[in-house]
Amino acid sequence: MSIRSNFVRLLKKQVNIIKLQKKCSHSVAVIGAPFSKGQKRRGVEHGPAAIRSAGLIDRLSNLGCNVCDFGDLHFSQVPNDEQYNSIVKHPRTVGLACKVLAKEVGKAVGAGHTCVTLGGDHSLAFGSITGHAQQCPDLCVIWVDAHADINTPLTTPSGNLHGQPVSFLLRELQDKIPPIPGFSWAKPCLSKSDIVYIGLRDLDPAEQFILKNYNISYYSMRHIDCMGIRKVMEKTFDQLLGRRDRPIHLSFDIDAFDPALAPATGTPVIGGLTYREGVYITEEIHNTGMLSALDLVEVNPVLATTSEEVKATANLAVDVIASCFGQTREGAHTRADTIIDVLPTPSTSYESDNEEQVRI
């Protein structure tokens, strides 16, 4: 990377930080999406409640955010929702849920909020990104996950739609997507150059083929080991923001973290992100000043073996979201009663000094 490009990035980063300091109050919409039909394991529908119970709303408020918690959406189970092609599960139910979520995310972003969607399983990202794109058609996506979620309905080995949302989003893959029941409303809204993956370490054969043959950018855990997370983020921003600033949609699956940190999730894969790597990603996204919407998905309290595992996973989810809005590891004090402009200076003499002289 040239010295000039490094200087330009540093200058843009400083300008964005100044903008963020001036705009100390983000307007944040929180939408709960308690949905689980994109996969087979019960409990992920309780993710929004677990994240809220871990103190999300208070944490965001203490960061100076104006938080509008819109509560949880209601998702209907479509009756007689037969499998597509004898493998794709709950297509009508998932399609309807994504349509409902797309509408609500679009409304929130259109009203000027940064939208936080609490999942729920990752099939929901098709809805949240579609709704976001309706308001911000030039958006880009950073997908942080152990999995690529880019199988098509014809390549999926499991039939679970939480492993397929990206294939529905990409224009380049639309000739590979059959007409799935429940998705007739859906239109692709991304090009392959609009998305970057971070944290991958469990890919199906068809996903490997798609990523390599369609030249989709991704950084696996091996890339992170070799390059370091700072370089990964620099290259990510070079691709997505190098030519122009544009809205960022962050889709963050909690299983991107190592299972030792996030045990309460449905598809854990050993060797994931450390706390420092994961939070560095979100701190750097915050510093761009371009975050417009984010998903935090796949927290599943039912799969934890102890209450401590539930707490650890939910607290980690809160830290991820909070660092998207200014929480840093140096501390983030934005409320008026915590900001210090001048350090106190002692006076030249104290009453205790005079008393000491009298005593002498």
From Swiss-Prot:
Expressed at differing tadpole stages in tail, intestine, hindlimb and trunk region. Strongest in tadpole tail. As well as its role in the urea cycle, may be involved in tissue remodeling. InterPro entries: Arginase, Ureohydrolase, Ureohydrolase_dom_sf, Ureohydrolase_Mn_BS. Mn(2+) 2 binds at residues 145, 147, 253, 255. This is Arginase, non-hepatic 3. SUPFAM superfamilies: Arginase/deacetylase (SSF52768). Coiled coil: none annotated. Induction: By thyroid hormone (T3). Its cofactor is Mn(2+). Belongs to the arginase family. Homotrimer. Keywords: Arginine metabolism, Hydrolase, Manganese, Metal-binding, Urea cycle. Pathway: Nitrogen metabolism; urea cycle; L-ornithine and urea from L-arginine: step 1/1. GO terms for biological process: arginine catabolic process to ornithine; urea cycle. GO terms for molecular function: arginase activity; manganese ion binding. It comes from the Eukaryota. Its EC number is 3.5.3.1. Mn(2+) 1 binds at residues 122, 145, 149, 253.
